[in-house]
Swiss-Prot record:
One of its GO terms (cellular component) is extracellular region. Residues 1038-1047, 1130-1140 have a biased composition (Low complexity). It is found in: Secreted, Extracellular space, Extracellular matrix. Its EC number is 3.4.24.-. The gene is Adamts12. This is A disintegrin and metalloproteinase with thrombospondin motifs 12. Pfam families: ADAMTS_CR_2 (PF17771), ADAMTS_CR_3 (PF19236), ADAMTS_spacer1 (PF05986), Pep_M12B_propep (PF01562), Reprolysin (PF01421), TSP1_ADAMTS (PF19030), TSP_1 (PF00090). Residues 1001-1321 are annotated as: Spacer 2.
Amino acid sequence: MPCARGSWLAKLSIVAQLINFGAFCHGRQTQPWPVRFPDPRQEHFIKSLPEYHIVSPVQVDAGGHVLSYGLHHPVTSSRKKRAAGGSGDQLYYRISHEEKDLFFNLTVNWEFLSNGYVVEKRYGNLSHVKMVASSGQPCHLRGTVLQQGTTVGIGTAALSACQGLTGFFHLPHGDFFIEPVKKHPLTEEGSYPHVVYRRQSIRAPETKEPICGLKDSLDNSVKQELQREKWERKTLRSRSLSRRSISKERWVETLVVADTKTVEYHGSENVESYILTIMNMVTGLFHSPSIGNLVHIVVVRLILLEEEEQGLKIVHHAEKTLSSFCKWQKSINPKSDLNPVHHDVAVLITRKDICAGVNRPCETLGLSQLSGMCQPHRSCNINEDSGLPLAFTIAHELGHSFGIQHDGKENDCEPVGRHPYIMSQQIQYDPTPLTWSKCSKEYITRFLDRGRGFCLDDIPSKKGLKSNVIAPGVIYDVHHQCQLQYGPNATFCQEVENVCQTLWCSVKGFCRSKLDAAADGTRCGEKKWCMAGKCITVGKKPESIPGGWGRWSPWSHCSRTCGAGAQSAERLCNNPEPKFGGKYCTGERKRYRLCNVHPCRSDTPTFRQMQCSEFDTVPYKNQFYRWFPVFNAAHPCELYCRPIDEQFSERMLEAVIDGTPCFEGGNSRNVCINGICKRVGCDYEIDSNATEDRCGVCLGDGSACQTVKKLFRQKEGSGYVDIGLIPKGARDIRVMEIKAAGNFLAIRSEDPEKYYLNGGFIIQWNGNYKLAGTVFQYDRKGDLEKLIAPGPTNESVWLQLLFQVTNPGIKYEYTVRKDGLDNDVEKLLYFWQFGRWTECSVTCGTGIRRQAAHCVKKGHGIVKTTFCNPETQPSVRQKKCHEKDCPPRWWAGEWEACSTTCGPYGEKKRTVLCIQTMGSDEQALPATDCQHLLKPKALVSCNRDILCPSDWTVGNWSECSVSCGGGVRIRSVTCAKNLNEPCDKTRKPNSRALCGLQQCPFSRRVLKPNKDIAPSGKNQSTAEHDPFKPIPAPTSRPTPLSTPTVPESMSTSTPTINSLGSTIASQEDANGMGWQNNSTQAEEGSHFPTSSGSTSQVPVTSWSLSIQPDDENVSSSAIGPTSEGDFWATTTSDSGLSSSDAMTWQVTPFYSTMTTDPEVEIHSGSGEDSDQPLNKDKSNSVIWNKIGVPEHDAPMETDAELPLGPPPTSYMGEEPSWPPFSTKMEGSLPAWSFKNETPRDDGMIAEKSRKIPLPLAGDHHPATSEKLENHDKLALPNTTNPTQGFGPVLTEEDASNLIAEGFLLNASDYKHLMKDHSPAYWIVGNWSKCSTTCGLGAYWRSVECSSGVDADCTTIQRPDPAKKCHLRPCAGWRVGNWSKCSRNCSGGFKIREVQCMDSLDHHRSLRPFHCQFLAGAPPPLSMSCNLEPCGEWQVEPWSQCSRSCGGGVQERGVSCPGGLCDWTKRPATTVPCNRHLCCHWATGNWELCNTSCGGGSQKRTIHCIPSENSTTEDQDQCLCDHQVKPPEFQTCNQQACRKSADLTCLKDRLSISFCQTLKSMRKCSVPSVRAQCCLSCPQAPSIHTQRQRKQQLLQNHDML
């Protein structure tokens, strides 16, 4: 018997959470005024509540105006109101609750109660019953709750207004009960106080054992099925069950019984309202379209057990309770279905903690009989009251009554993912409505199609079943829906739009979604709500939409290639689908037809043989067998097979394949369809009554038949002699001898050597012999023989006579058709013939006409195509046709491929044109010609519901490791795995990037102008020394500057000063990856050493000069050209010249080291425009950029950084004087770049910047410049110390040329750069590594003042010497305990839970990829165990049965000698026995003795009856073979008869036969007859003899 687990109902769906009953504790006691509770019980209950409110409800009109303090519904005649349509059923109430006015818009609820609905209160037995017909009172109301100023309901209510307002209402923040203060007098205003209290939890959760004695296995379902079929054969002999797949309305008349604990718990006053509310929810569940049938749950009777009922035992044991309840409810159910309180199913609601199988608490909540509907003794279930989930328990158990099994048990409807079903064993939290699975739909449909719901066809006395639907989103707002999905801390994501299509919830700061739409009724705007995925204006409640049938599907493939297969077509109730309580479709949902009816070849196996052979490759009990079919007459549509050379059979399939013949052999055409044997007529129509006449003409009248009769007269013969030929197609064959003789009939084929009967002088037994396509019945009684066969024969056969004696003559006859010798009519009568041409396929333009071939019967016309051979069917003919020209229309081309294969941005396009058909061509027209038509969409979204595969996820950049001088910053780059696929390593973003490239401040930096600098790029030969020309490497020689060119890796764009830093930062943040477009991009894992590791060649270093003038004294006329081309003058060698040296100078702005602006990264050759905010520092500065240039062609990738020193002081001359700029620069100053690119052997480029603070005007100190002896070469710098080293310097000649080109104003005005003055500043070291490899750690660095005294740097904010770091969580594997081994021997397995956890926070779980970096493989999830081979169980003989009848037990000892036996295969130690009832022989009274004297006999009745009280059904099953049957006859009146004084009668005067005839006609009373037949008609006994017989009877009676 199926049962429901407690966890199945632990989670609720919003579809039916309209009403809840129970209680919920929280809050404080608040009441507006002191109130006294006259009723002690109510006072005790209310005072125990943690919070309650006193309110005074008033009845108002639709506008909120007070009508009356009286709350009772004014309507008194329920029948009148129902007939009137309920125009006055609308009621409005108002209460003030929690400082808010709540308005109740309620309607009288007539929907699920019959007109004859009765409430019974029983007090122990039938003699103490109070019955109340409650359906006439319009007390029960249902509707919505509104707040003041709103038009959309915020909740629902189910109230009773019979005596005040009693019931329940639901608000978004909680559930509340309301009831009047009992026995309280009216207030001064005439109002009546009510108490409102919050729903409390009924009891604390209990830990229950996960044991549920569920018995919905295959064996149990087969057993229940057999019992059901046996009951139907015995009980429903006269009823013809409808077995068509037609959807009809069904009404389940329901009895609900509440036990004493339920009544006590809810109270006699509230229990009815509670139960009716629950049943209302059950009705809604069965109105779900997913059930595929139109089923109404109608309550006809409610029984409230005020005291323990006699004959009904409700205990903890579920099966015992169910057995007792089923027997009790049958006894109180009126047998007549016309009785208004007759019920089809009974539902028990109990507060007992029931458990299936064991007498202790467990998680069982319900129990039912499988497939028990419409069986009076089995249509019942019990349910444990658990509050609101009770509705789901009852619906679940009623499903079992309809034959629905648990999802996932013996079917493939195991709940997948998050979505559960009503018949699931367990249900999780889910905001979507609970539905019935496709398996549940198939189970109940099959149950009803088999006619097993015959008792549900009668319509109860009702006035309509329209459902009052409330959209669930009206009750549960988006926050509540999120809490149902993700727990109590979840909220709605306000940032996400279009909530009607997808509900997004905020969980721990992240927006998450299950990609489900918000529930219907959810608010989506001002006076708008969601309905069917769209945001529409709020109006009235949505009208119910009744379902409509969709189009029939195409016919399926034929199940057979020959021999009459089956095809099916079905339609769905989706045009439209029933919504908002609309009725499900009624009518035929699936139809079948036969196909390929031509016979199969005789040498092919039967269809059942083919199905059995499918199991030849399937092991059965660890062995393989060859199976062949076994026919079961009781179940012709189930597949039973038996192995060859074995003596057992097994049911392989519950239903054979459609089209399998119900009966093999014979003339029956009946086939199995959907497991049911269907009648098939000779026209091969299902459920057809068409029959053949005598000669096999379907629906013929016999006019085409002729009967051939012949007589074989040959008297003598030897051996086998031919009698005559029975032709092919002969029917009604009869052969018989005229008189008995010793001869034998025989049958042979046209082959003289092939005999079918009595051949080879061997005489066969009487019986049926299958030959020539029919069955011949051979019958021999004595020496008289005959043969009978119905035909038709599929070949001609010869009748023969084996002579033994003289032949008295043999008659034989058969019936054939008149129209030819060949009786194979199908080949002669049916043929293909083309029909008419169809209409043109189009109404305009060029179309096609078609001509199809139809199967035609000779002389009758078109018939079904199954009568003709499909292999010879001609192809359809077609020809073109042209109608008038078509008007303009929109044409849509094929959709292009989606722009993305996954993710939320996919779109696909197509071409949409306005065209017109011109003959056979299409002409494009302007779109205005089609503007009157709806234009198809040219752009739609696609693939947005598909998750993208794995991709890289980057974290935030860390702080730079240094504040200046060049450092590194890092970020995490992880693979966010989707679908367990790896990420593309070629697209992995960088995890490291350069930063802090601005030069650290230093002192003693002087410059000397050089007049020989040629900005034009030409090499100017001069006798003066040029200290700015670098000394090339010994292996290279100087090369004249060439025409200015810009390499591809370098950008010619000039960034503005005030946007440099912001551009870099924004681009990196937007892309999630820095340096991505940089030609010097660093690959992951690159290192940045402080010096080059190359020793083969010293790289040539070039320095670039950056000058920042006073931003407040910049003359626009002195700046020169403002275009990018003018600001950049770059000279470089072609990349293909490996030995050339190119010098590039760069003039860039400089910023004070004391600025608070963010750090700026300058990327050499970046290709990205970068902006940096302009610093307001008054000082002018020069920045030296040291640029390493590759020597050969090599990838522009950076894996090493070279620290750069300042320009060498030894080559600096006097400090020039810079005139102040007279005009403030509006905007930003571009950078001047002269870059020297020199090849390097390491193939990489490194760039560093050093900043030189410029002294203020007036502080200039002249100095002499030193000349170089060598005008062509300079010593290469060999150190990176800021205070020493070598490098190029700016000479006076260089400065003069810069002035000439507009770069500098006057060479004499920059001598102030030579001032040896620099303020103190902080010197910071490089950041250390993180102090920890995981978890929270710290970076450290040294911070000291450049002067050596920290006090000198107090005016400058000291950089942080330390900062936090968190590389990754400290992850580790946490393993659970191993489970018990699945087998105790022969190899099992055990499993455990393995989780990636935070090793510091043991309660925090991490994603598995955090643990993939741990050493070693992850801990295994499973391992093998108990590998020892299993031993054999040793069993002892069975003991004697413990009882001789009434169900006993046999026991035996079972042991395992070695202790290693498979416990799953342990033989049973007990077995039931002697289940038959305990019965005995009961004897009746002896009848009168048949004679008065001389020895007569008398009899009595003897019956085998049960020894205990039982029903008539039990009496039919009684067997008394264990007792000796008492005698049924005994002798009597043994005394001799006293002779009469009359003359002795020796014999009858008339003949004995005639006297016996008269006696049988009861004529012995006639004196003349008695005189003539004195012996046959003896004289009547005398008075004395009669008295003696009476005394004898009295004595016999006393003996009994």
